[in-house]
């Protein structure tokens, strides 16, 4: 219990710092009304039976998260698979408190424990992955909750912007709020979430997820985005100079059981 209180206060302090710097953006949206996103990346071991991990997601983890109040869990694979395979899991929580509460509840959830039995009995010499990475994000003030797209075949683009300092990332987040959201929508680049990363690697950074019907629509969307007059105004504003030092992106496909 003491550990949980420490984690909650520590992460809340980190989130509070982000909120304090971003409150000027669009009108004092408190952190309590913005979702917390956990993003996990699993890299499978060579030759591992990935169906065992997927069965765990389908029959144990996702149903348990749903029971405890998480409305939609996203599970994705790479658009163009690599070897070893990778899986990506997006869990949107209503708050940091919900994230910590569910972490504790899963330890005593008998249905989850039963449904996880096969997964948990995998021997060490048949481990599915070495480790998974995890990051926590606080939703942007101007996009405080996840937008779940229609359940149809589509491509997702995960984009990460790293900054050379906290101020650089804060200024980039302000740039989103000062005009980028409607440009994305006009261009047909459909946002799923925007997150200010408050715990994880490669900090400081922000991450967001877009979706389109296919790669052709994605390419047309970005062409429209960079040609938009409002975008040209934004990039000409000196306050947004040197906000990004590195951009990385990944193309993802939802699994058949993904809820996002």
What do the PLM-derived regions correspond to, one by one?
Residues 4-25:
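N-terminal export signals
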Residues 7, 100-104, 160, 173, ...:
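Non-transmembrane alpha-helical segments in soluble domains
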Residues 19-33, 62-88, 94, 178-207, ...:
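Short, glycine- and small/hydrophobic-rich beta-strand elements in well-ordered beta-sheets
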Residues 34-45:
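Acidic/histidine-rich, surface-exposed loop or edge segments in extracytoplasmic proteins
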Residues 39-41, 88-92, 158-160, 207-209:
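Conserved hydrophobic/aromatic beta-strand scaffold that supports enzyme active sites
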Residues 43-53, 59-68, 72-147, 165-167, ...:
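Hydrophobic, ordered structural segments
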Residues 139-215:
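Surface-exposed interaction/gating patches
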Residues 252-259:
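Short, low-complexity, Pro/Ser/Thr/Gly-rich segments in the mature regions of secreted, periplasmic
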């Amino acid at each position: 219990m003491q550990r949980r209180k420490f984690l909650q206060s520590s992460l809340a302090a980190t989130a509070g710092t982000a909120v304090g710097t971003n409150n000027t953006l669009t009108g004092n949206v408190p952190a309590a009304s913005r979702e917390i996103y956990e993003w996990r990346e699993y890299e499978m071991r060579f030759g591992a039976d990935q169906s065992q991990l997927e069965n765990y997601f389908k029959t144990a983890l996702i149903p348990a998260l749903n029971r405890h109040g998480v409305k939609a869990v996203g599970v994705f694979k790479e658009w163009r698979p690599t070897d070893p395979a990778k899986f990506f899991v997006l869990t949107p929580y209503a708050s940091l408190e919900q994230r910590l509460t569910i972490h504790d509840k899963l330890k005593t959830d008998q249905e989850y424990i039963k449904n996880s039995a096969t997964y948990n009995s995998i021997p060490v010499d048949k481990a599915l992955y070495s480790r998974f990475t995890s990051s926590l994000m606080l939703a942007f003030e101007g996009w405080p909750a996840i937008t779940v797209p229609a359940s149809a075949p589509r491509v997702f683009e995960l984009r990460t912007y790293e900054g050379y300092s906290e101020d650089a990332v804060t200024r980039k987040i302000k740039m989103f709020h000062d005009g980028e959201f409607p440009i994305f929508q006009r261009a047909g680049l459909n946002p799923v979430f925007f997150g200010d990363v408050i715990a994880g690697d490669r900090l400081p950074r922000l991450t967001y997820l877009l979706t389109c019907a296919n790669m052709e629509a994605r390419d047309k969307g970005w062409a429209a985005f960079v040609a938009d007059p409002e975008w040209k105004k934004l990039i000409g504003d000196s306050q947004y100079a040197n906000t990004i030092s590195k951009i990385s992106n990944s193309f993802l496909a939802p699994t058949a059981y993904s809820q996002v």
